[in-house]
């Protein structure tokens, strides 16, 4: 009643034909590039989730006025001289 048709090219190949089927250099390069992009995307996702879970750990603990010597923090007299 119902016949099953396989349109996949690898399903019709014999075992020795499958071993002979190889990716071209362009396909290998494309797969390597996509793989590197996926690894980079994964690292960015992990970094973003770490920042979302603990946002204050990535901020520096010093403030802008730590480097001032002899002046009070919050005064802008040093900018006028």
From Swiss-Prot:
Pfam families: Cortexin (PF11057). It comes from the Eukaryota. Keywords: Membrane, Transmembrane, Transmembrane helix. It is a single-pass membrane protein. It is found in: Membrane. Belongs to the cortexin family. This is Cortexin-2. It comes from Danio rerio.
């Amino acid at each position: 009643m119902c016949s099953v048709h396989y349109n996949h090219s690898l399903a019709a190949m014999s075992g020795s034909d499958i071993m002979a089927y190889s990716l071209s250099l362009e396909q290998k390069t494309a797969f390597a590039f996509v793989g590197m992009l996926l690894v980079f995307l994964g690292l960015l996702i992990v970094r973003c989730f770490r920042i979302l879970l603990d946002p204050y750990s990535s901020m520096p603990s010093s403030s802008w006025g730590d480097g001032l010597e002899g002046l009070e923090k919050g005064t802008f007299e040093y900018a006028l001289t």
